[in-house]
Amino acid sequence: MPRSTTTSDNSPPVPDDSAMATSPLMILIDGHSLAFRSYFAFAKSRQGGLRTKTGIPTSVCFGFIKSLLEVMESENPNAIAIAFDTKEATFRQQADATYKANRTETPEDFLPDIKNLQQLLEGLRIPVITSPGYEADDVLATLAHQAIDQGYRVKVVSGDRDLFQLVAPDKGITVLYLSGAFARGGATVGPTEYGLEEVEAKLGVLPSQVVDYKALCGDPSDNIPGVKGIGAKTAVKLLKEYQTLDNIYASLDSIKGAVKKKLEVGKLDAEHARYLVQLRFDTPIDIDLDQCQLQGFDPQVLKPLL
């Protein structure tokens, strides 16, 4: 880990920013997040998206590799890994059958494109990491904490706001947020780096409060309702005053009117939503971080795909 300095008044150690800035950088990529953005960038601008002359879909491969190379060029990482979801039900879906049940069906030509992409990544010797029963976000959270424990800085590439809960610049973790990885037609719009200030400007809360924020107001994109009747503005107001969900419920007597009633009725919903939103840092993954060091490509794997 980067060095810390200790102040003379025995206050907590302060991270040494100069040491952190020279620490090796690991880029962690939310594979499905970038893949879907790549797919829809071209599907919307071209009827049927990109294809080879023989009809093989290539929107995902083209857009993903294009963005990957641009991130590598701009960030110059020492190591990289990409996490993908798996087809198996996750522990969240087992706990709640309605979790992500609002998602539209995956386009038919997306899956073969993903398969070809993962073969391309294998040829580039970039680790593709999955964990059945867990989401890619959980894999990324676990990898990020393993990486900082081994002295890396970490930048997570994703368009999923759930990953904002990982942001901790004092530990060396930021998110390269794909608010618009592509413009219409595939023109590149680069990711924006999110630290504490950016997350707070976007959501109104700090990264450490993201889980409790979503526990209160829910997350429609994942079909998580949160506490009925508590919207984003109320969630932000409560967290600014009480800091955490637990503190809010410990202070119900000081909360008046309809908000108090909604919180009382929705306590179990808040706890359930928090369980669904919280990323796991103990995801079982079978990889040594040394395997994430950048390596040369494997021509024998790449040739049949090009």
Protein language model annotation of sequence segments:
Residues 2-6, 17-157, 161-184, 188-189, ...:
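Noncatalytic, basic helical substrate-engagement surface that gates or grips nucleic-acid strands
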